[in-house]
């Protein structure tokens, strides 16, 4: 009876260890997915910034051309 309890306790111990390893791997996989979304968000923000800067530059050059035209009275 005592040896049977020992073996059952040993099997329970091994099962608990393997379960904790599985949970650790699962949480590591979930963390990787979160990092991908953060990287994607960062890349979208960077693209948005470059588009906004390009639009501001083109609008600024348009305004400057109009001002130069009105100052020179060549319009």
Curated annotation (Swiss-Prot):
Pfam families: Antimicrobial_2, FSAP_sig_propep. Residues 25-40 form a propeptide. Keywords: Amphibian defense peptide, Antibiotic, Antimicrobial, Cleavage on pair of basic residues, Fungicide, Secreted, Signal. This is Rugosin-LK2. GO terms for cellular component: extracellular region. GO terms for biological process: antimicrobial humoral immune response mediated by antimicrobial peptide; defense response to fungus; defense response to Gram-negative bacterium; defense response to Gram-positive bacterium; killing of cells of another organism. Expressed by the skin glands. InterPro entries: Antimicrobial_frog_2 (IPR012521), Frog_antimicrobial_propeptide (IPR004275). It is found in: Secreted. Residues 1-24 form the signal peptide. Belongs to the frog skin active peptide (FSAP) family. Brevinin subfamily.
